[in-house]
A protein has these predicted regions:
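His/Asp/Glu-rich acidic catalytic environments and adjacent acidic regulatory segments
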Residues: 1-28, 32-35, 76-290, 305, ...
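Membrane-entry segments of alpha-helical transmembrane domains in multi-pass membrane proteins
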Residues: 14-26, 49-54, 252-257, 295-299, ...
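Active-site-adjacent, His/Asp/Glu-enriched structural segments that form or flank metal-binding
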Residues: 35-39, 43, 47-50, 54-97, ...
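Aromatic/His-enriched, Gly/Pro-containing loop or helix-boundary segments
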Residues: 79, 119-123, 134-138, 252, ...
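Active-site-proximal, well-structured secondary-structure segments within enzyme catalytic domains
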Residues: 126, 130, 159-165, 169-219, ...
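Short histidine-centered catalytic/ligand-binding loop motif
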Residues: 230, 237, 252, 354-361, ...
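Extended, hydrophobic alpha-helical segments in both membrane/secreted and soluble proteins
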Residues: 278, 369, 464, 480-492
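Short pre-active-site segment immediately N-terminal to the catalytic Zn-binding motif
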Residues: 361, 468-488
Length: 492
């Protein structure tokens, strides 16, 4: 049987990754992983090697990681009902298998025996470190728990996966369900023209207004929310947008309040089962903070250091509003701080950040980014033409074109400038849409390897995703300075 999610080809045929293929592909991947784990467990303890234990464990679930990784990526950038349903059906099975690996007593015995072998001292520092981290991962995942406690731990892991997934779905769905339609253009005073035009076109696309009688649609997506909170003169408009942002995942069909309480309780139970005082201690135990108390101390210390400057700035903004309105201002409301801070900044420094946008088209920003990194690291970054098909849709890509999951997505190849060797490639998906979760992130789809053992280099395949200003009509996407910083951050 053909398994598109498990296809190891470097370039992904995204249109073949349909919701219908999720169950058979992940079922097959779990079956392969179970057989690989069984092989590790069945070997005699007297003849263990690195390759037959830790090396084999690293590769045991490769197909599952590949397939599920692609599925989770599509869940983040292209959430749709049939796909969500298929993921919901398979998530418990994936979690059950993943939890069972560190809870497998025979596998744990084999790994501990291998870690105590004399040959470990002759391994490279990288492999020794991998052994240490793997053992720590297993202990952190319940390997040392008594057998009668392991089922409870596995059930907690399963419930956490389901509830955190539902939490994220509620955030996306409640964000998409919220809209504010403005009928009076006077309410939009102060908004940049680009934000007004984007809101007008969004309203048209969603059935509000006409060319002759326009309406303006605002949502809780950052590119719609942020300009209003920073520039809109209407206090009422800013307040409604702020109240909307506070309503995401709160009340109604997409309420997350009960889920949050359940997730916190499950995390606390998990931490106590593993011998930690609280979940914060568990989460920080292998990080620089070392404990929840240390992390909280750091946060409180930082808070105490910055609070005086913050209060000083807010007092200056309060006085500024008082001066400009001629009215007594006891304190600033949350929907006022960004607006009045921006007006004060413009007056103090005679600088409007919006004036930078014409210089920050996505194309120019990417060109500048690549120029900097080419000089730093001796690489070249080259765009490739792209083509997008709908899931299940067959089509022939133009020669040299790379298939992507959405028409907005770009694709680049990265080569060594001197040798021309292909080091890796990456996708870039910069603009918001209803099927895409909020925020910005980078991730890998397949991890490359340097040349070794006579094998050539395996290039890396990664991705960068954001939710930045969209093109307006036939005009290019012009970014804010903060959005430019985000692109540099994700690429770095």
């Amino acid at each position: 049987m053909n398994h598109p999610y498990l296809d190891p080809s470097f370039l992904v045929s995204w249109s073949r990754l349909t919701p219908e293929a999720i169950r058979p592909d992940i079922t097959e991947a779990i079956s392969r992983a179970k057989e690989n784990i069984r092989t590790i467990c069945d070997q005699p303890l007297e003849s263990l090697t690195y390759e037959s234990t830790f090396g084999a464990l690293e590769k045991a679930s490769e197909d599952l990681h590949l397939g599920w990784g692609r599925i989770m990526h599509l869940d983040s950038v292209n959430d749709e009902p049939a796909q969500r349903e298929a993921i919901g059906e398979m998530l418990p099975e994936v979690v059950t298998f993943s939890s069972s690996v560190p809870l497998n007593p025979r596998l744990w015995t084999v790994l501990k025996a291998a870690a105590s072998c004399d040959w470990v001292e002759d391994l490279s520092p990288v492999r020794q470190r991998f052994i240490q981290e793997t053992l720590a991962d297993f202990r952190e995942s319940g390997a040392d728990l008594p057998d009668d406690v392991k089922p409870e731990y596995a059930e907690i892991e399963a419930q956490l996966s389901l509830k955190t997934k539902k939490f994220a779905e509620n955030v996306l769905d409640s964000t998409n369900a919220w809209e504010l339609i403005v009928e009076d253009e006077a309410e939009l005073s102060g908004l940049p023209d680009s934000a007004k035009e984007a809101a007008r076109l969004d309203a048209l696309a969603n059935g509000h207004g006409t060319e002759e009688a326009p309406r303006w649609r605002f949502t809780q997506k950052f590119t719609s929310l942020q300009p209003v909170m920073q520039f809109a003169d209407s206090d009422s408009l800013r307040r409604r947008m702020w109240e909307g942002s506070c309503s995401i995942g709160k009340g109604g069909e997409y309420d997350n309040e009960a889920l949050i309480a359940e997730i916190l309780e499950l995390r606390d139970r998990k931490a106590h089962l593993l011998g930690y005082g609280c979940f914060a201690d568990y989460a920080t135990s292998r990080r620089m903070a070392g404990s929840g108390a240390n992390a909280l101390k750091f946060i409180n210390d930082l808070h105490d250091k910055v609070k005086p400057s913050f209060l000083k700035d807010m007092e200056a903004v309060r006085r500024y509003k008082e001066e400009k309105t001629g009215k007594s201002v006891e304190k600033l409301s949350p929907w006022e701080t960004g607006y009045w801070s921006e007006k004060r900044r413009r007056e103090l420094y005679a600088f409007d950040e919006e004036d930078l946008r014409p210089y920050y088209s996505v194309e120019k920003v990417m060109e500048g980014l690549f120029s900097i990194y080419s000089g730093l690291y001796g690489i070249t970054v080259t765009p490739r033409p792209t083509v997008a098909f709908k899931p299940g849709e067959s089509g022939e890509a133009p020669e040299g074109a790379v298939e992507v999951w959405h028409p907005d997505v770009l694709f680049y190849e990265l080569h060594d400038a001197e040798s021309g060797e292909h080091l890796g490639s990456f996708y870039a998906d910069w603009h918001p849409r209803d099927s895409k979760r909020a925020g910005a992130w980078m991730n890998c789809l397949s991890v490359g390897e340097p040349p070794h053992g006579g094998k050539p280099r395996a290039p890396h395949l990664g991705l960068m995703v954001g939710n930045m200003t969209k093109p307006v009509g036939d005009k290019p996407a012009l970014l804010s300075h903060r959005e430019v910083e985000t692109i540099f951050h994700e690429f770095g």
